[in-house]
A protein has these predicted regions:
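Active-site-adjacent structural elements that line small-molecule/cofactor binding pockets in enzymes
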Residues: 1-281
Length: 281
């Protein structure tokens, strides 16, 4: 930890070419290294694992480490009651370790593949959350929920009773700062005690050819339109990791998940060394 900010590492579940059969070993090494959580991201039309299945695999190979989604995209999953069941299943098999970051989903291809119109997503998301909230009435089934989104209405929604806070985007420090201020304001206006949980994430690549590995992965994942902003916040040196963690903690983040650009198991050890004592609870 840095101050009170918890440091997690992402699973390589969205890294094309990664050996997904070793995902459990990756999670076990992360737990042994002292990270607070393992995280997943979500897309449909891409070479990645379903995030909930990836987290269930991680849960089976660990006993203490937290599980975080940043985020599971709700709106192109047509049945929110089914999604609530899947999420509560991860809660139960993990012994309550799952923090469910939930969002609407922004990739047009995912909506096209799901035959769901991209308009009206705010209302769709709110309706789905209501269904899921009702489904999580039994003891031991409700996850800690944090809500993602960048629009003012989405950030305001993070103060809803179902939510424990806000999931910030993977890059953009100014956007993060503005979002934290807006989330805290919404929290106060809603009469919530204390401050919201704020979860953010960054990409990292460490070791030989770190920059080349990061370039190749981010170009493949984001394409030309979003490559530059994603790459600008990607961490490719130990000093860069430590400096960014200090900056995120100073901004008010409660959790950060660092996502690898490679599926190599050595990324766990390299990141642990880069973070140093801050990674040890």
């Amino acid at each position: 930890m840095i101050g009170t900010m918890r440091i997690g590492i992402g699973l390589p579940a969205a890294v094309p070419g990664a050996d997904m059969a070793r995902l459990g070993s990756f999670a076990a090494q992360a737990e042994q290294a002292g990270f607070e959580s393992v995280g997943v991201i979500d897309r449909l039309v891409y070479d990645n694992l379903d995030p909930l299945i990836a987290l269930a695999a991680a849960a089976a190979c660990t006993s203490r480490i937290g599980l975080i989604s940043t985020v599971v995209n709700v709106n192109w999953r047509a049945n929110p009651r089914l999604l609530a069941k899947q999420i509560s299943s991860v809660v139960r098999v993990s012994g309550g370790r799952f923090t469910a970051g939930l969002g609407m989903g922004g990739w047009p291809a995912d909506y096209e593949a799901s035959d769901i119109a991209p308009n009206g997503q705010g209302k769709r998301f709110a309706a789905a959350l209501a269904v899921m909230d009702e489904a999580w009435r039994s003891p031991g089934e409700r996850p800690s929920v944090v809500l993602g989104g960048l629009a003012p209405a989405a950030i305001a929604r993070s103060a809803a009773p179902v939510s424990d806070g806000w999931v910030a985007p993977l890059f953009g420090f100014e956007v993060l700062q503005q979002g934290i201020a807006a989330a805290r304001d919404a929290w106060a206006r809603s009469g919530r005690a204390g401050l919201p949980r704020v979860i953010t994430a960054r990409y990292f690549s460490l070791g030989p050819q770190a920059d080349a590995v990061a370039d190749a992965y981010l170009e493949h994942y984001y394409g030309a339109e979003y490559f530059a902003p994603a790459r600008s916040d990607t961490l490719t040196s130990a000093g860069g990791v430590r400096a960014e963690l200090a900056r995120l903690a100073g901004a008010g983040c409660t959790d950060v998940v660092l996502y690898p650009c490679s599926g190599d198991l050595d990324q766990v050890g390299r990141l642990s060394e880069a973070v140093g004592d801050a990674a040890v609870p």
